[in-house]
Every structure is written in C-alpha cells, then in structure tokens.
C-alpha cells in the first residue's frame, strides 16, 4: 500500500497536525508516591464535573488512518525536558503512555492516566531511564538533562506525540509534538489550587477595618493575597506573614470601599497568588453603609420598646388609658372605731336620783375635749331593791355622794330614756353568781351600807373577785367590777381608765 494513499489531505493544507480537544485540569490533581501503594487516579479534563467526568483528549486534523500516540511528561518551562515523574495507568510503561488508534476514532481521550512522583534521591535514575528509552520529544542535549536542580517537582505538562505509518507500515513519520497546560500538584502550597473554605463573616463597614478569619487550602505565607474586586475597582486585605496560620488560615482586615454608600454593595472576594497570578473561586462580600450607632444601642432600645408595646396592643386600647382616680368617700369616724359603753355620760343618770349633770358633780369635767360615746345595746340589769330604798328622789346628790364616798360599788347602768327623766325601769334583780354573794349584798342594802363592817375582809375580797371574774364573761356592754367613787374631780381620768373608757 502506498504511503500517500493512507493520507487524506484537505485542500489547501499540506500536512496533518495535532490539536488538543480538551485540556487537562491544571489544579486539583494530586501527585502520589509509589510507596503509597494505591492508584494515582486519573487526570481530569478542565470541563470535568462530579456528574459529568471528562478527560484530556486530542484529535488529528488533516489525516484519516491509523496513528500511534505517545504521551509523556515534560517540564513546565522551556526547553521542555522529559520530567522525572512517571505516567501510570492502563497502556503505560517505563513512565510514558503509548497506544495505536484506528481511523474510526476522531477524538482520542486518555481516561486512565495518573501522575506518580519520584523521590529526590531517585531523580538521576529516572532521567537515565528516559534517555535510554529515547523519551526526549524536543531533543534537549543530554548534558542539560542531568542538571537535577532545574526540575520543578510540583508541576508537569503533558506532551502529545503522533506517529504516522510509512510505506512499510512502520510508525516513523512523527508529527510536531504538542504540550498541554501545566498540571500542578495539589499537595504543594505554592502550586496547589486556591480555595476559600470558610469565612467568619461576609459583610463589613464601608470604612473597612473589619477583622476577617478566612480558612483555605494550603498557601504560601509569602505568596498569597486577599483581593476585593468590583468592576474596575480593586483593593487588597491588610495582613502580614505572621497572620497566616499554618498555611490554612488568614486573619486580615478589610480595605475601605471606593466611597460612601447609602445601601449595601456586594463585591467579590478571592485569593490570588502573585507568583503565577492564580486566583480562587470568588465569594460575595457586602459593604454596609456607615452607621451612626455602631454599638447598636438605638436598635436595642427600639426592640425593647416594641417588646413592651406588643402585649399592650394585644390587650386592647382600653389598657393604655389611665384610669381616673375615684373620689375618696367620707367615712364617719364612728365606723372606724369600736365603741365601748361609757359608764359616765355627760348627763349621769342614776336610779332613784333622777338626772345629775356632770358639771354639777364635777365642774372640771366640762373642760374635757372629747365627748364620751353613748352606751350601745346590751344586757341592762337594774339595781337591787336596797338601792331603791337607799336612794330616793328626796335626798340631794351631794348628800348621797358624801354618805357613800368610801364604801360603795357600781352596777351596770341602764340605758337612759328621755333626757332629764327620773323614772326607773321595771325591777329586775341582779343575777348574782352564788347564794353567798347574793345574801351579802342583801344584808348590805338592809343596813344602809353599814352592814359592810360586819363582813370580814377576806369575805369582801372573795365577793369582789368573784364578781369581777363573772363580769368579764358577760356581754361587752356590761361592766362588773368593784371600784371606789371619786372623791375629787382629779380622779375622773383614773375612774375612766378603770371602767375601760375610750374616746
């Protein structure tokens, strides 16, 4: 078969060439050591996603037929020397990939290519292997290949070579090699993909100066910056190398915005590596207008006011009206004081004597400022018959008082009828505690008070004490006690204290 019959040239184009259909992803691929004992994985394509995985691929233009493809690793910078790292995967041997493809495949994809890195002590051995296998796409002099210090072990490129068959069917016609974009080791901080993992806040003052804590993948503290971008405006966050913590955290302060704003403005915040101008995926950052109350005290007061107003509104508008004070009713003083019966009213009324004015008996009583209260309802017992015989209306009040000034006793005073009346109620004998006391008072009355001398002192004390004890258990309007009639007007207050007088 003639060699020219295997070539299908397009009109106007004399030679076939290689074109990269999809570039490999530059960042995100991890170079693995052989000692890790696991697959190096596959190099993803630049358009690969989690749901739709793609891989690096090429196509041969201006040619239709069989072709042999060789893929190797070369250095990032010119001259492109064979790299000491190895390509591993299906179809790989001695650190490179080689396979034949028929005319039915227009696009050639490489799905199982991984990168395996070598140790520094094995670099010379790896380069010697490349030379022995004639893996030198750009024919770099051998002397330059042994310069180990010039190799960057954190970045490689894919080199695609295509060999077409000659008239004997041997793949001896080589097309010009083509290199891909650089592929960076994801473990190396100076070449790894930049990525913002998390920030503690995504907004700040338009004046800048807000402290931001940013978590990221590994970065070089002397080769990283935080950039804020909006259109043609660009600013950088302020931080030093000491603010980069273990290559995975950056503490910086935001730059001020271009000018004053009246509403929030959203800008883009991203990491950038100055050495290769690599940038991360941006995140949103909002600049807020300058607040007159940065501490938020005004907002707190408003929230507190609203918290009180809501329950009041729920209860109704009537609650908010202040109730009017009701007038204080006039209370009769008699309603607040407990009235006790007074044994000595302004007009003293004694049975059998008629009505005696207190001013006649005790002239000093008329000067008392407080008038005694009237007797309340209660049990009213009349005097014994001896008192009716002793105190007739004929004797004067003065002779009666002089006669019984030293030996007398008090009984319960009946409620007087009309003012100035001398009539006595119906006779009702006293309820004496026992027969002994009853006979004593009866004898006392028959002798006109002189019978008291015939009674012993012990008997008098027993009679008096029993009368007092019995009297305390009667109704509140009664008063039973043994007392001495006052001899002088000055003894009236003492008498009132003895009978329980209350103003």
From Swiss-Prot:
List of residues that carry Phosphoserine: 275
Main location (coarse class): host cell
Gene Ontology MF annotations: DNA-binding transcription factor activity, RNA polymerase II-specific; RNA polymerase II cis-regulatory region sequence-specific DNA binding
Keywords linked to the UniProt accession: Host cytoplasm, Oncogene, Phosphoprotein
Motif annotated as Nuclear localization signal, chain positions: 298-303
Subcellular localization(s) per the UniProt record: Host cytoplasm
One Gene Ontology cellular component annotation held by this UniProt entry: host cell cytoplasm
Residues in coiled coil: none
Location of the RHD domain: 16-305
A GO BP entry: non-canonical NF-kappaB signal transduction
Pfam families associated with the record: RHD_dimer, RHD_DNA_bind
Role of this protein: This transforming protein appears to have a protein-kinase activity.
Protein name (database record): Transforming protein rel polyprotein
Gene: V-REL
């Amino acid at each position: 078969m003639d060699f020219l019959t295997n070539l299908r040239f397009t009109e106007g184009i004399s030679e076939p060439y290689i074109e990269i259909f999809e570039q490999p992803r530059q960042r995100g691929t991890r170079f693995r050591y052989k000692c890790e004992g696991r697959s190096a994985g596959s190099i993803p394509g630049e358009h690969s996603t989690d749901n739709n995985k793609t891989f690096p691929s090429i196509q041969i233009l201006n040619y239709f037929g069989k072709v042999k493809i060789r893929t190797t690793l070369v250095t990032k910078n010119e001259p492109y020397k064979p790299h000491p790292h190895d390509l591993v995967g299906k179809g790989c041997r001695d650190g490179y990939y080689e396979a034949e493809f028929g005319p039915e495949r227009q696009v050639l994809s490489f799905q199982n290519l991984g990168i395996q890195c070598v140790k520094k002590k094995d670099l010379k051995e790896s380069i010697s292997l490349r030379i022995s296998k004639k893996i030198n796409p750009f024919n770099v002099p051998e002397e330059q290949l042994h310069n180990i210090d010039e190799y960057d072990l954190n970045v490689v490129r894919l080199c695609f070579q295509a060999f077409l068959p000659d008239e004997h069917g041997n793949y001896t016609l080589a097309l010009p090699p083509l290199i891909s974009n650089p592929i960076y080791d994801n473990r190396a901080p100076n070449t790894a993909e930049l990525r913002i993992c998390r920030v503690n806040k995504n907004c700040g003052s338009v004046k800048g100066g807000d402290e931001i804590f940013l978590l990221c993948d590994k970065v070089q503290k002397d080769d990283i910056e935080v950039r804020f971008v909006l259109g043609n405006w660009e600013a950088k966050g302020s931080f030093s190398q000491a603010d980069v913590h273990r290559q995975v955290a950056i503490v910086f302060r935001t730059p001020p915005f271009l000018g004053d704003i009246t509403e929030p403005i959203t800008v883009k915040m991203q990491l950038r590596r100055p050495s290769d101008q690599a940038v991360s995926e941006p995140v949103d950052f909002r600049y807020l207008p300058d607040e007159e109350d940065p501490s938020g005290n005004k907002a707190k007061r408003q929230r507190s006011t609203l918290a009180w107003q809501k329950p009041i509104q729920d209860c109704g508008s009537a609650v908010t009206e202040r109730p009017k004070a009701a007038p204080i009713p006039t209370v009769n003083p008699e309603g607040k004081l407990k009235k006790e019966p007074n044994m000595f009213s302004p007009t003293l009324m004694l049975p059998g004597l008629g009505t005696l004015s207190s001013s006649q008996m005790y002239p000093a009583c008329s000067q008392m400022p407080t008038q005694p209260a009237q007797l309340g309802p209660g049990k009213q017992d009349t005097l014994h018959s001896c008192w009716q015989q002793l105190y007739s209306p004929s004797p004067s009040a003065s002779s009666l008082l002089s006669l019984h000034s030293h030996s007398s006793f008090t009984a319960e005073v009946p409620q007087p009828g009309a003012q100035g009346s001398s009539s006595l109620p119906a006779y009702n004998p006293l309820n004496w505690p026992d027969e002994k006391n009853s006979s004593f008072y009866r004898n006392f009355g028959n002798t006109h008070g002189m019978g008291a001398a015939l009674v012993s002192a012990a008997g008098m004390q027993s009679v008096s004490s029993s009368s007092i004890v019995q009297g305390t258990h009667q109704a509140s309007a009664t008063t039973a006690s043994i007392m001495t009639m006052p001899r002088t007007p000055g003894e009236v207050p003492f008498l009132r204290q003895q009978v329980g007088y209350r103003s």
